[in-house]
Amino acid sequence: METGNQTHAQEFLLLGFSATSEIQFILFGLFLSMYLVTFTGNLLIILAICSDSHLHTPMYFFLSNLSFADLCFTSTTVPKMLLNILTQNKFITYAGCLSQIFFFTSFGCLDNLLLTVMAYDRFVAVCHPLHYTVIMNPQLCGLLVLGSWCISVMGSLLETLTVLRLSFCTEMEIPHFFCDLLEVLKLACSDTFINNVVIYFATGVLGVISFTGIFFSYYKIVFSILRISSAGRKHKAFSTCGSHLSVVTLFYGTGFGVYLSSAATPSSRTSLVASVMYTMVTPMLNPFIYSLRNTDMKRALGRLLSRATFFNGDITAGLS
């Protein structure tokens, strides 16, 4: 790349959704509503699982971690975007940009790995039901989640640290609403070969592990279900995996959509819309997917809300 006019970045300009003030106001209301729904939905899932002993099982343990990852994944970018729209100040500091890259990559990778772990959990539940509690013991569940966290943090840290070696040109505009790593690399004047190698290697390894794990799990699940003679047992087995399969399809479908939109057209607006689907819509829908058709989860949420209402009533009565 060109080496002239290099500088150490102090701040970047997030162009985001360039629109009139009226449209910006509408976007602020829309994104704030989506964020509040996402935050509340995932927080309720976590609280319901923690407060209900009936949900202290491997499946719900992984689900609570997924909800936490989704909550943090969205919180990494959306609050800053809302602040930028509200104040009309679209600048982000260099340190803030690196922080966004690190946490966005960490929680995105964690989402990916947790979905793979949950696919393995469903495989054991359907294909080895009699040995489920022995195989999916608390020690293994803890190690799977801890391993997912470690891989996510280490991979993200490596990608973020490679950005520190870069010098940037005078053009500091990012055509996005957050510090997307690939967009930041495009602004660098110094050589980004090492950065690209790290990104594509990490993405490739993670993609192969996740795709292989999920594909193998559901390959075995489908063949196990087809061998079941009872229609009722078949339906129960399918319903056990339905929510997870829906979330997997939504997660990878929107992620693949972001990639295709970036590769097919240079339009930043198309990429922005695809990124909103990936960073906001998917985490917002996950709590609904896991709770609407899950009787145990709906009961736990009902008990949680009942206790909250009762507690609020006691406080109100005490103050009056």
UniProtKB/Swiss-Prot annotation:
It comes from the Eukaryota. Residues 1-25, 76-99, 161-197, 259-271 are extracellular. InterPro entries: GPCR_Rhodpsn (IPR000276), GPCR_Rhodpsn_7TM (IPR017452), Olfact_rcpt (IPR000725). Glycans are attached at N5. Its main location: membrane. Residues 47-54, 121-139, 218-237, 293-313 are cytoplasmic. Pfam families: 7tm_4. It is found in: Cell membrane. Odorant receptor. This is Olfactory receptor 7C1.
